[in-house]
A protein has these predicted regions:
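Internal gly/pro-rich beta-alpha loop/helix module
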Residues: 134-206
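ATP/NTP phosphate-donor binding region
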Residues: 22-97, 278
Length: 349
């Protein structure tokens, strides 16, 4: 019986792939796992395992895709996104760049936990001038009222819209489109989890149409200097989380482990605790890049406020949260270790 179900799913996916209606855009669906590919024993329970359903099954569950695009599915990895790695990011980058001329757009199915990070990495590194859309789900594929099928349909619709490429890499979920730089996951369980806290969504999806209302002025994809096509690894950058009563053990551990850069998830306007400050000051003097960010979800970490960044050789992250500041610092360090040049990158991207 299991074999029969598998054959039916593959056949349905093949039918979707074989759609040949005149003028349909060619979309490659790159699957990485996540809740959208999750499976649970109960349709109403909360327990499930991420990354269990293949990309062929995901596509087969939405036969309506054949009406809007020619779909080519590809399984890149099969993981929960809490286990995302730099290696997977580099693999996705390579795959899209290599396949760019073959397709009109790309959809990446992905777990929501680190989706914003993958989106931002690709937003900074892709050389492809085609729409790239990430999508996931907050309920597993076996869940009652699963949001994955509708989200996948909307993501393909978004990738098929040529104007999407002008936005850089985007996330399309819950009928809205948000750009990779500004998006963040805001809720642990609700379907409407993705928001762009500082600047809001860039588009909406309604009645089979994607409408864009705004556009980020930040440079992205082919406009950036961060070409990682020949890299096999990225610089090591860690995050230090500041809180009341924090000690310097974590910061010192990153220094001792010879990390290339450290991002401080500071309080307020990226402020550093007195237990951490001297460690990071010394680290910056010894050539370790230090970026100040904030654990506060909105607002900017501004230069030379309570902390004289120029005096200590620190970089301020602007509106980037700590996890995205880490990514930009990783990429910046592939080009330079000069804190002033790194600051320019944070001001531009």
């Amino acid at each position: 019986m299991k074999l029969i179900k598998t054959l039916i799913a593959v056949a349905a996916a093949s039918a979707c792939v074989a759609a040949t209606a005149a003028g349909l855009p060619k979309i490659e669906v790159l699957a990485t796992g996540g809740t959208i590919a999750g499976s649970g024993a109960s349709a109403t329970g909360s327990a499930y395992q991420a990354g269990k359903v293949s990309v062929n099954h995901l596509v087969a569950a939405v036969p309506q895709l054949a009406d809007i695009a020619e779909i080519t599915p590809k399984q890149v990895v099969q993981i929960g996104s809490q286990d995302m790695t730099d290696d997977v990011w580099l693999k996705l980058n390579k795959t899209i760049n290599e396949d760019c001329r073959k397709f009109d757009g790309f959809v990446i199915t992905h777990g929501t936990d680190t989706m914003e990070e993958t989106a931002y990495f690709l937003n900074l590194t892709l050389r492809c001038k085609k729409p790239v859309v990430l999508v996931g789900a907050m309920l597993p594929s076996t869940g009652l009222g699963a949001d994955g099928p509708r989200n996948l349909y909307n993501a393909v619709l978004t990738a098929a819209e040529k104007k999407t490429a002008e936005q850089g890499v985007v996330i399309a979920m819950d009928n809205i489109v948000v750009n990779a730089r500004d998006v963040m996951k805001s809720n642990t369980v609700q379907p409407e989890t993705f928001v762009a806290g500082n600047f809001g969504k860039v588009g909406s999806i309604f009645n089979n149409k994607v409408t864009y209302e705004s556009k980020s002025l930040r440079k992205h994809t082919y406009e950036t200097p961060f070409d990682v096509t020949k890299l096999t690894k990225l610089p090591k950058v860690g995050i230090v989380y500041t809180h009341g009563g924090v000690e310097g053990i974590q910061a010192q551990a990153l220094v001792d482990a010879k990390y290339d850069g450290i991002v401080n998830a500071g309080v307020g306007n990226g402020n550093l605790h007195k237990a951490i400050f001297p460690i990071l000051e010394k680290a910056a003097k010894n050539g370790i890049a230090v970026v100040r960010s904030s654990r506060v979800p909105t607002g900017a970490t501004t230069k030379d406020a309570e902390v004289d960044d120029n005096k200590y050789g620190f970089v301020s992250s602007g509106t980037l949260n700590p996890q995205k500041a880490r990514i930009l610092l990783q990429l910046g360090l592939t080009k330079t270790h000069d804190y002033k040049k790194l600051q320019e990158y944070f001001d531009q991207y």
